[in-house]
């Protein structure tokens, strides 16, 4: 599992080291081959594991590959769309791994884990949308500020809803007045009605 993180770090470091220069077709092809080789090596490492640990390792390896490919494309053909795609790939990879880690749990603990993973995924996706709005050109500073403010407002609403669902799931472990108070506190904390 640590290998996937090391893989991501080395690929990102390699990509950042050459990010100031334009990437040639040969460099792009070599980087793609390295990503593929790193993924195969990570998969081989995962094959030694058993049960859910193997599943988690495979999700980490696949996520690392997807993120590295998206970041490579963002570097090879820089654009706001490619950068956003890389952010989304990172969010999706983290979500897949977090969800897979929940499989070791049972009952309410598993439900809470899945809701927490979903909340983290929603947060990452909404942050990517805000960054996309901030990078989008506008006719004036006021217009750009309004676009970013609207994106932040929408993102906050989505994040609060996801966090509320996770908090509410935690409350399901309780009963009676304690559960009612817990749900009311969660509603108040995340602005839900």
Cite the ranges covered by each PLM segment:
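Mitochondrial intermembrane space
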Residues: 3-4, 14, 18-193
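Short helix-onset patch at the extreme N-terminus, typifying the N->h transition
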Residues: 7-8
């Amino acid at each position: 599992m640590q290998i996937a993180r090391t893989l991501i770090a080395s690929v990102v470091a390699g990509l950042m080291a050459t990010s100031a220069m334009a990437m040639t077709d040969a460099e792009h092809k070599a980087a793609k081959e390295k990503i593929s080789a790193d993924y195969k090596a990570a998969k081989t490492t995962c094959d030694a594991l058993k049960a859910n640990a193997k599943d988690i390792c495979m999700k980490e390896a696949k996520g690392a590959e997807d993120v590295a490919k998206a970041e490579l494309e963002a570097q090879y053909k820089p654009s706001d769309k490619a950068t956003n795609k890389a952010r989304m790939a990172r969010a999706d990879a983290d979500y897949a791994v977090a969800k897979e880690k929940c499989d070791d749990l049972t009952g309410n603990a598993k439900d809470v884990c899945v809701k927490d993973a979903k909340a983290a995924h929603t947060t990452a996706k909404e942050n990517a949308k805000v960054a996309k709005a901030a990078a989008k050109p506008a006719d004036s500073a006021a217009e750009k500020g309004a676009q970013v403010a609207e994106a932040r407002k929408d993102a906050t609403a989505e994040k609060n809803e996801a966090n509320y669902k996770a908090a509410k799931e935690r409350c399901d472990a309780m009963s009676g007045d304690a559960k009612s108070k817990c749900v009311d506190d969660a509603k108040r904390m995340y602005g839900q009605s």
